[in-house]
C-alpha cells in the first residue's frame, strides 16, 4: 500500500511511551514493517508571571510545560494495519497526527 507517518505528542512521557508500545505491538501483529519510535526534541514552553497583583516587579514566578514527541513510520502498510490502528484504544492525553505518504 503506502507509508504511514504517525506523530505523537503528550505532556507526560510515560503515557506517550506506553501508547507508542501499544501501536508498535498492533502494527507488528499485522506483519507491516515499522521504523521507530524516533524520539523528537522535547519542546519547553516557559511562562513568567508576577507574584503580586499590583507592584513589586522583582518578585516573579516561572512555570514551564514540556511537550514530548515521538515519530513512527509504518512501511508497506496493509488494510489490516490501518484497521488495527483505527480499532486501537489510545490514551486521551496523547495527540496523534496521521499522515499517509507516497511510496
UniProtKB/Swiss-Prot annotation:
Alphabetical GO biological process terms: translation
GO molecular function: structural constituent of ribosome; tRNA binding
Keywords: Ribonucleoprotein, Ribosomal protein
Record InterPro entries: Ribosomal_uS10, Ribosomal_uS10_CS, Ribosomal_uS10_dom, Ribosomal_uS10_dom_sf
Alphabetized SUPFAM superfamilies for the sequence: Ribosomal protein S10 (SSF54999)
Pfam (any one): Ribosomal_S10
Keyword Ribosomal protein (UniProt): yes
One CC-aspect GO term: ribosome
SMART domains registered for this protein in UniProt: Ribosomal_S10 (SM01403)
Gene3D superfamilies listed in its UniProt record: Ribosomal protein S10 domain
Source superkingdom: Bacteria
Family stated for the protein in its record: Belongs to the universal ribosomal protein uS10 family.
Quaternary organization: Part of the 30S ribosomal subunit.
Function: Involved in the binding of tRNA to the ribosomes.
Protein name as annotated: Small ribosomal subunit protein uS10
Gene: rpsJ
Amino acid at each position: 500500500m503506502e507509508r504511514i507517518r504517525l506523530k505523537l505528542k503528550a505532556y507526560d512521557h510515560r503515557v506517550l511511551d506506553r501508547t507508542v508500545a501499544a501501536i508498535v505491538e498492533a502494527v507488528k501483529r499485522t506483519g507491516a514493517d515499522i521504523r521507530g519510535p524516533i524520539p523528537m526534541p522535547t519542546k519547553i514552553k516557559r511562562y513568567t508571571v508576577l507574584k503580586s497583583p499590583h507592584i513589586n516587579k522583582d518578585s516573579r514566578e516561572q512555570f514551564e510545560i514540556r511537550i514530548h514527541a515521538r515519530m513512527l513510520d509504518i512501511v508497506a502498510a496493509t488494510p489490516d494495519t490501518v484497521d488495527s490502528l483505527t480499532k486501537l484504544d489510545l490514551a486521551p492525553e496523547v495527540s496523534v497526527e496521521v499522515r499517509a505518504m507516497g511510496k
